[in-house]
Amino acid sequence: ILSNPLPPGTRKIGSPGIAYGNEVTILTTDLSECAVNVEGEIAVRGPNVMLEYLRNPETTKSTFHGDWLRTGDLGRKDADGYLFVTGRLKELIIKGGENIAPREIDEALYSHSDVVEAAAFSRPCETYGERIEAAVSVCEGSTLTEPDLISICIEKLGNFKSPDTVHFLSELPKGPSGKIQRLKLQETL
């Protein structure tokens, strides 16, 4: 669906490219099209995009907006049409009505050289609806503490987007593809 152009075309770091043979758009929560560089849900349509779930009209209805397939992925498109994937909709943290991408918090945690793996996730909260926690694994011999990592996040993201708690694990849970499973962290910690 997406591809980086061949030389002399431009490749952009962090982007899987632009749409070829299909269309890609970014949808707001009310399913209208987002402006350039505004994050929303990635939707695709084209001749090789599925039409429906077999014998499952309810799932088909919730997955499609007209002929646009809603992917469940979050992203943004720049002015040149390059897509940047920023996360998964079901992993989005909604704190006090504000959408917070967990990857933003991950990147703040990864900014310390002792952090080997990092993943932010949400927990229910009576005050804000959801609160932020994170899990990290650090290199052997590291003296990093929870307050150290929270301070890094506050410095880079501000207090509102920073985790309340940071869990230290020897290894974060991963799926078959090797991706860290945030939802598993929610269940097990």
Predicted regions and their residues:
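Extracytoplasmic/periplasmic beta-strand context in beta-sandwich domains
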Residues: 1, 164-165
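Conserved ATP-binding loop and adjacent catalytic segment of the adenylate-forming AMP-binding
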Residues: 1-23, 36-40, 49-51, 65-66
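Beta-strand->loop->alpha-helix junctions that form or flank phosphate-binding loops
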Residues: 16-19, 121-123, 167
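Generic structural signal for residues in well-ordered beta-strands
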Residues: 24, 118-120, 166
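A structural motif
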Residues: 42-44
